[in-house]
Amino acid sequence: MQVTEINAEGLKREFKVVVPAQQLETRMQDKLAEIARTVAMPGFRPGKVPMTIVRKKYGGAVMGEILENAVNDGAGKAITDGGLRPAMQPKIEITKYEENSDLEFTVAVEVLPEIKTMDFGTINLVRDKAVVPDAEVDDALAKIAERNETSEPVKRASKSGDVVVIDFVGKVDGVAFPGGTAEGYSLKLGSNTFIPGFEDQLVGKKAESDVEVNVTFPEGYGNETLAGKPALFEVKVKEVRAPKAAAVDDELAKSVGLENLDALKTAIRDEISRELDGVSRMKLKRALLDALSDGHDFPVPPSMLEGEFEAIWKQVEADKEAGRQDPADAAKSEDELKADYRALAERRVRLGLLLADVGRVNEINVTQEDLNRGIMMEARRYPGQEHLVLQYYQKNQEALESLRAPLYEEKVVDFILELAKITDKEVSVEDLRKDPDEASADGEAAPAKPKKKAAAKKKAAE
């Protein structure tokens, strides 16, 4: 087998591979001899079938297998002998093959670039930090109290936010319809639980009032027999109840499983603190990625760039069609937009390659402990359903593997942050949560590079 490099342009490599006819024939004879040792055919004892008959019956299939193996071996040899790291699957084209002649084909491959990393110790970053305001803790307590509110009877007329206890019978064309009758139903006015217009007509009513509620079922109503039809509900208001917020005290804390009010306040403060730490981490990571992007300008494989751009552009077009276009994009021509998003795609690919290379060189790996921690973080996103999340990952290997990429990236980012110089800066909660793409209140400009598009598909290495 002869392998010759015929093109080396940028990250593209192309090789010509020639497999001599005699080598193919030798492989053919070896394989046919192996078959002949065990094959049974009418009129012959096992292992005694003439080779000419074996070749006639099995030669075509065997040669197909031999050619496939020869192509794979040739492509592998071209890559291995050249010490290449392919960026994508090689493209193979058979240029010449006839029976009893040499096999010739080409192998075209894009390789990963040689990456010379910057000195991470020269990176200077500012990490915004914020203290949890007491007002946010108080707001969270008020919301918990609101969720645990009760109600008490009142003698006045009902208003939005009250609960009315009602009996009702719904009729269409004077005939009661299935599911349109209830007794002692508690309805919170303003909750939009019922069809549009129903609750509004019960505002200003007192207990023991009889009310005729006229409404029209929406065209898209789930029950097709009622969709779009006018209806009359005969309603009896049995009771009007005003909401009464739960007291913010130890009993409220106990209702959510904590010992006392101080414990509840601590839990709330810790939760908000974790959220602020997450925002701080996100902004620090973005600043790091900006610095890494500015500090590296190696070429990226064209196919990877094109694939990333196509994925982004497909999402941009889908968002535009759905009415979710980024307002900043509306005034730009398609050519301008494509240039912007291609620059974004190139940044993503370059950063992805850089982080992968840093991880490879420094032998950073995702351990089982990392995966377990990632699963627990996912589970915390679904309070009350944690066990279902755990079961999902236990039974779904593909989903489990999908956690590896973001976990790997975070470990590489942590590695680089350990080497960078970081200065902590106390900021207000409002400034911490401010979108970094917007100019800050003191006039500081956002980074002069393609922004992350709200409407575009998000990737970790932005």
Swiss-Prot record:
Keyword annotations of the record: Cell cycle, Cell division, Chaperone, Cytoplasm, Isomerase, Rotamase
Biased composition (Basic and acidic residues): 428-437
GO molecular function, one term: peptidyl-prolyl cis-trans isomerase activity
Compartment(s) of residence: Cytoplasm
Chain residue ranges for the region called Disordered: 428-462
Biased composition (Basic residues): 449-462
Name of the top EC class for this enzyme: isomerase
Keyword Cell cycle applies: yes
InterPro entries, per the entry: PPIase_dom_sf, PPIase_FKBP_dom, Trig_fac, Trigger_fac_C, Trigger_fac_C_sf, Trigger_fac_ribosome-bd_bac, Trigger_fac_ribosome-bd_sf, Trigger_fact/SurA_dom_sf
Role, per record: Involved in protein export. Acts as a chaperone by maintaining the newly synthesized protein in an open conformation. Functions as a peptidyl-prolyl cis-trans isomerase.
Protein's UniProt name: Trigger factor
Organism: Paramagnetospirillum magneticum (strain ATCC 700264 / AMB-1) (Magnetospirillum magneticum)
